[in-house]
Amino acid sequence: MGQLLPKYNILTEDQVQKIHENTMKILEEIGIEFEYEPALEVFRREGQKVEGKRVYLTREFVESKLKSAPAEFTLHARNPENNVVIGGDNIVFMPGYGAPFIYELDGSRRKTTLQDYENFAKLAGASKNMHLSGGTMAEPQDIPDGVRHLQMLYSSIKNSDKCFMGSAEGKERAEDSVEIAAILFGGKDVIKEKPVLVSLINSLTPLKYDERMLGALMAYAEAGQAVIIASLVMAGSTGPASLAGTLSLQNAEVLAGISLAQSINPGTPVIYGSTSALSDMRSGSLSIGSPECALFISASAQLARFYGVPSRSGGGLNDSKTVDAQAGYESMMTLMAANLTGVNFVLHTAGILQYFMAMSYEKFIMDDEIAGMLLHYMKGYTFDEDGMAFDVIEKVGPGGHFLTQKHTRKNHKREFYTPTLSDRSAYDTWAKEKLETKQRAHARWQQILANYVPPALDPEIDAKLQAFIAQRGKEVGEE
């Protein structure tokens, strides 16, 4: 959706320039290691200094590559009504990503299954606030690793007609994702002209990219598909114990990845990604439910605008191990930071617990409510004739009320947010059952799944997808 409220810039122009200059110095004097010979060959071809696996990128090279990256692009869904524009004034929400565990209502934790993935794909498909339906929402531990990405992709396609993410687990799995997308949309030539996949490419901080991520990045760039180039620097452990230094380190890694993508295929849709946070000095754990993480979210959105590319950051981020007040207030802080500062692509919007390690059905429903509230908040005020409401104010006059006015019946659904989870009833009504938020969320996700009907998928395309997945299973020895 388009964002109507003005974006908040947390950094001054001078501070942005200081980060940029520090970043250029890192890239030129320290360099980045790329553990993948095809990537090193690209940089050699581009005239950049390569010593072993370390690449030194000049300011002129990086700045020229940024110019070829689109400021915004459309990601296409199999249902065109669900296409999303990434960049500009738009904000796109999608569920959590990469979690190997599920937290149950009773607080217990278990490994994720393919059924969990399918359930989250359906919940995302049913949500009016989630714009994408899947990536690696809940990585199924009951599926062999070699075919896990295939089953997740198929589940995303089968259970929703929204946009979805491709696998970033190396060159072959990225190519599998492209092949599946080509089957779904009618050929590789078709999807090269209109991107249908977005994938998450993470640096290996500090100042490295590994073979797995580089292989995926290059495969997607060659196919014309979108890539999020992301860095997760943990201030105090994988990054310096200063926020500006950590931001500079993150910026260097992201710009290096963007430069590679643009060198392979100029115009490749890229998204500037950040999940940088800190390492808690007491436990050593990653802390994403922290004010420092919210600061990185805010600054990353501003840096992306400075470089003229879309941004990815934020989400319902928290460090809690259960669906409690901590999960709520930390998630609201990081989601609000993303909204107010103009982040375009918000991964991990719904369901995440324990610093990316787990998903929760109840948390998904609670985060979906937060997302709905924030989308409404970002619409701001309406200033047309109905919005100004002079006529009805004049009609009611001093001491009257507006409940029975036609203006109220006409405008309240447009102007007011109606919650799907929050309880606004009178105390006596609430006291009959005294349900806590997570108990209401538990009932709601079960109701959604019971009533959800996945959108139809063309039987011929479905058969081709299943045949490809079966063939790939044989080839990797995991039928």
UniProtKB/Swiss-Prot annotation:
<comment type="similarity">
    <text>Belongs to the trimethylamine methyltransferase family.</text>
</comment>
<keyword id="KW-0808">Transferase</keyword>
<keyword id="KW-0489">Methyltransferase</keyword>
<dbReference type="GO" id="GO:0006730">
    <property type="term" value="P:one-carbon metabolic process"/>
</dbReference>
<keyword id="KW-0554">One-carbon metabolism</keyword>
<dbReference type="GO" id="GO:0015948">
    <property type="term" value="P:methanogenesis"/>
</dbReference>
<dbReference type="Pfam" id="PF06253">
    <property type="entry name" value="MTTB"/>
</dbReference>
<dbReference type="InterPro" id="IPR010426">
    <property type="entry name" value="MTTB_MeTrfase"/>
</dbReference>
<dbReference type="GO" id="GO:0032259">
    <property type="term" value="P:methylation"/>
</dbReference>
<dbReference type="InterPro" id="IPR038601">
    <property type="entry name" value="MttB-like_sf"/>
</dbReference>
<dbReference type="GO" id="GO:0008168">
    <property type="term" value="F:methyltransferase activity"/>
</dbReference>
<comment type="function">
    <text>Methyltransferase able to methylate free cob(I)alamin in vitro, using glycine betaine as the methyl donor, yealding methylcobalamin (methylCbl) and dimethylglycine. In vivo, probably carries out the methylation of a corrinoid protein, likely the adjacently encoded DSY3155, with glycine betaine, to then supply methyl groups to tetrahydrofolate (THF) for ultimate conversion to carbon dioxide; oxidation of the methyl group would also provide reducing equivalents for anaerobic respiration.</text>
</comment>
<protein>
    <recommendedName>
        <fullName>Glycine betaine methyltransferase</fullName>
        <ecNumber>2.1.1.376</ecNumber>
    </recommendedName>
</protein>
